[in-house]
């Protein structure tokens, strides 16, 4: 089950039994998108609350520059050494929300809830024309579980203003 899956009509961001998919599983699933929508007000509030916890984790204030936030996330991930599933999932939500909000603020991307034909849903930040996206919670989870290398800063710096017209929610990771 994915990070925010279990109701076809509502995207719940947190649930004790939900864990993010590994990023390679998410890539396979991106071709199965059946519906997507901008996040609602409740989801926005929850993402912002989780991002605020992420800022506390890395010891920064909301006014911090994007580069400082990225350095903080990268350093936190490099030093993270827990194998506790609940702690890993919590950190994925917090740092994933912080990364997504940082991408949103810096590049003008927007948060979306995406539903797949598997009855699962997840949150991502997507480019203005919805051609590219980053499933930030899943991405951070894959780093915390050592399934993906920590290239947070590289990913952030490779984001472009525009992507090929044939792309639709192409997953960046």
Where are these regions (language model features)?
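Short secondary-structure junctions and interdomain/linker hinges
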Residues: 57-61, 80-87, 102-105, 110, ...
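Amphipathic protein-protein interaction modules
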Residues: 91-145
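Short hydrophobic alpha-helical segments enriched in small aliphatic residues
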Residues: 5-10, 25
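A recognition module on extended beta-rich or small alphabeta surfaces enriched in W/G with H and D/E
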Residues: 125-173
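N-terminal low-complexity, intrinsically disordered segments
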Residues: 26-89
């Amino acid at each position: 089950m994915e990070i925010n899956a279990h109701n076809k009509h509502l995207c719940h961001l947190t649930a004790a039994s939900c864990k993010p998919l590994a990023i390679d599983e998410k890539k396979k699933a991106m071709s199965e998108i059946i519906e997507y929508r901008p996040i609602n007000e409740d989801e926005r509030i929850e993402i912002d609350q989780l991002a605020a916890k992420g800022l506390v984790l890395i010891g920064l204030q909301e006014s911090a520059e994007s580069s400082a936030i990225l350095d903080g996330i990268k350093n936190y991930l490099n030093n993270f050494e827990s194998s506790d599933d609940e702690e890993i999932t919590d950190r994925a939500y917090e740092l994933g929300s912080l990364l997504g909000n940082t991408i949103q603020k810096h590049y003008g991307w927007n948060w979306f809830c995406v539903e797949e034909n598997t009855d699962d849903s997840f949150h991502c930040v997507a480019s203005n024309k919805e051609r590219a996206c980053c499933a930030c919670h899943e991405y951070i989870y894959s780093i915390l579980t050592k399934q993906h290398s920590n290239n947070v800063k590289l990913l952030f710096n490779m984001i472009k203003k525009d992507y090929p017209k044939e792309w639709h929610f192409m997953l960046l990771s």
